[in-house]
Swiss-Prot record:
GO MF term list: DNA-binding transcription factor activity, RNA polymerase II-specific; DNA-binding transcription repressor activity, RNA polymerase II-specific; E-box binding; RNA polymerase II cis-regulatory region sequence-specific DNA binding; sequence-specific double-stranded DNA binding; zinc ion binding
Similarity comment: family membership: Belongs to the snail C2H2-type zinc-finger protein family.
Annotated region described as Disordered, given as residue ranges: 34-90, 116-148
UniProt-recorded name of the protein: Transcriptional repressor scratch 2
Assigned GO CC terms: chromatin; nucleus
Lineage: Eukaryota, Metazoa, Chordata, Craniata, Vertebrata
Keywords tagged on the record: DNA-binding, Metal-binding, Nucleus, Repeat, Transcription, Transcription regulation, Zinc, Zinc-finger
A Pfam family reported for this protein in Swiss-Prot or TrEMBL: zf-C2H2
Location (main, coarse): nucleus
GO annotation, biological process: negative regulation of extrinsic apoptotic signaling pathway via death domain receptors; negative regulation of transcription by RNA polymerase II; regulation of DNA-templated transcription; regulation of neuron migration
Amino acid sequence: MPRSFLVKKIKGDGFQCSGVPAPTYHPLETAYVLPGARGPPGDNGYAPHRLPPSSYDADQKPGLELAPAEPAYPPAAPEEYSDPESPQSSLSARYFRGEAAVTDSYSMDAFFISDGRSRRRRGGGGGDAGGSGDAGGAGGRAGRAGAQAGGGHRHACAECGKTYATSSNLSRHKQTHRSLDSQLARKCPTCGKAYVSMPALAMHLLTHNLRHKCGVCGKAFSRPWLLQGHMRSHTGEKPFGCAHCGKAFADRSNLRAHMQTHSAFKHYRCRQCDKSFALKSYLHKHCEAACAKAAEPPPPTPAGPAS
């Protein structure tokens, strides 16, 4: 899983106002959550279980000052891993010391805020699937901010019609239209595989340098977070929990896909049974399993012995 998809935690302000019920704070939410609070569905199809900032800012006591926000992760030395998904993270260390498991709750709003690939906001120029996936989280946020500042202008590809928020994302996409016979195509010096996209070639080169090895089974990986995900198969750790139903996952990408099942927007519909799904992959699985079996004719009944 690319480093750009890591969702950083946001530390809340530890102050409480009179007249307002004590709120709870989710690690990745940017607003306080009231127990049992309900409201109409938001723009992303979820109920906004949050207390608006205006309701507690008005009752702030005179002379009360908020402590300055501290960084969510302390600075680490160059040889240390500050990445929470690294194999040397404190979370993995607690597992190997036999301490209790910790699962953080994540809501879909956290992915809309921090995930560069997140898209589909109602009335807001729904981007395509590959619009900012290569650019990463920071690039995705910058691209969306630039699109809003520029009146929603999108950069369109002249060959396939796909649109992108930034010209750099469009330029990166145009590389995929190159021919393998083009002079701009490059080959891997190790295995000779040809690529027309330079970011794809860069990711491929990492597969020939498997520096991160599992201390349990010896399997090697090109990236520390890939090793971290593999280590969870040994520890049983599931640190990514759904804030809506409580189901936990070992990998953030699996949680992101699961979040779509809670969405009110299900765009993919089966043509045979009219059932709708939030993800195209779920529709494919449904068509291959349930509908495909229902459409098959029953096997012929074997004829009995002739009398």
